[in-house]
């Protein structure tokens, strides 16, 4: 099997990047179809439109209705065709960006994504999650290439709720450990090949950046200001983690996250919050050294990520519920089977309960 690495064609980051990106966007198309929900359009829409128009790029802005569904994609594509735009810009959170990617794919147009939060590593990826109109998961759309441009305006992201940035750190926390597991197992990555040394190195840099800058970045976000630490964490959450996961692979941490989604008491948690606990469970599952586990526990406590089942909202009927989570985690096709050893529901059940006790012990110190 070939080794494979993929990434966006261009990644831009910095204060006011949502305005300054126009100088690069003009190389992609002479007109853009801009989508965002009402809140984001008021927050950043004017910035983006001005950034395009200042470089003589025509644009048409349209409201996104909030659901990345085939019906919404088709509705927006019809408007795009009527307007004759030759590129797509999505501004906002995951569903808006996924919709922009889908429109670009179906219309064979360049795509620019402008996240307003740094809560996951999804913006750089070559996939969209499609839902029904009722908001239920329908399918993944896998694209032949990543977005043409990812634009991270750190001045906008600094004003977002701190918990979203911390959730992004939780998602990014898993990247190194899952990438290394996939590398050791010679597993097939999301990119369709085996991991390169470059992708593995980016995953490691992601982890090292979290440990060095995470707490400082959280405080900057709390103050709503841009610092060098915040810049580095935004890059880690988005680019380093994005390339690391897509070109190396996912393993136990994300599968355990998926298992926890069956519990109603975990529905209030953000993606990265569940992934962070899944990372602790993966470390137990693979019998990582205690000093490594304690490093991760300390990081999670400092930035505000859950390290116990109680913090996840699971407080009653624990044994039975975790047995169900473990069974879901090990479903056929789940990424936990990328681990470099055989995994069973029983071993996952044991790892989760042990991770919980390790978290309790750490908090009681």
Label each PLM-derived region with a short phrase.
Residues 288-365:
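C-terminal charged capping/lid subdomain of soluble metabolic enzymes
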Residues 41-45, 95-102, 120-124, 249, ...:
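Short glycine/serine/threonine-rich phosphate/pyrophosphate-binding segments
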Residues 15-16, 36-38, 91-93, 114-117, ...:
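Fold-independent oxyanion-binding glycine-rich loops
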Residues 80-117:
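A short, small-residue-rich loop immediately preceding and capping a beta-strand
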Residues 1-87, 309:
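ATP/NTP phosphate-donor binding region
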Residues 190-305:
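Active-site segments that bind and position negatively charged phosphate/pyrophosphate groups
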Residues 105-198:
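A glycine/threonine-rich phosphate-anchoring loop and its flanking beta-alpha core
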């Amino acid at each position: 099997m070939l080794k494979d690495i993929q990434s966006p064609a261009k990644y831009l980051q910095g204060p006011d990047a949502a305005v300054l990106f126009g100088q690069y966007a003009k190389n992609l198309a002479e007109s853009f179809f801009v989508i965002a929900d009402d809140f984001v359009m008021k927050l950043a829409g004017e910035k983006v439109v001005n950034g395009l128009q200042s470089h003589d790029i025509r644009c048409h802005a349209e409201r996104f209705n909030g659901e990345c569904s085939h019906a919404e994609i088709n509705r927006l594509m019809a408007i795009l065709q009527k307007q004759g735009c030759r590129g797509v810009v999505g501004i906002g959170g995951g569903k808006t960006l996924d919709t922009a990617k889908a429109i670009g794919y179906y219309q064979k147009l360049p795509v620019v994504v402008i996240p307003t939060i740094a809560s996951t590593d999804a913006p750089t990826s070559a996939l969209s999650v499609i839902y029904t109109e009722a908001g239920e998961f329908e399918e993944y759309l896998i694209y032949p290439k990543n977005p043409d441009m990812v634009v991270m305006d750190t001045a906008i992201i600094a004003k977002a709720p701190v918990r979203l940035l911390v959730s992004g750190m939780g998602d990014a926390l898993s990247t190194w450990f899952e990438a290394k597991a996939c590398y050791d197992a010679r597993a097939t990555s999301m990119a369709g090949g085996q991991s390169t040394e470059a992708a593995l190195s980016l995953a490691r840099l992601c982890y090292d950046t979290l440990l060095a800058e995470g707490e400082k970045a959280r405080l900057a976000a709390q103050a709503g200001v841009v610092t060098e630490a915040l810049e580095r964490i935004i890059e880690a959450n988005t680019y380093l983690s994005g390339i690391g996961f897509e070109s190396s692979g996912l393993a136990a941490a994300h599968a355990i996250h998926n298992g926890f989604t069956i519990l109603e008491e975990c529905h209030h948690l953000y993606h990265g919050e569940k992934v962070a606990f899944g990372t602790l469970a993966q470390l137990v599952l693979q019998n990582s050294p205690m000093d490594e586990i304690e490093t991760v526990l300390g990081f999670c406590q400092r930035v505000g990520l859950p390290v116990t089942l109680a913090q996840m909202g699971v407080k009653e009927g624990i044994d039975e519920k975790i047995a169900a989570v473990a069974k879901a985690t090990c479903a056929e096709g789940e990424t936990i089977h990328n681990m470099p050893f055989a995994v069973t529901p029983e071993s996952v059940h044991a790892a989760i309960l042990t991770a919980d006790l390790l978290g309790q012990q750490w908090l009681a110190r």
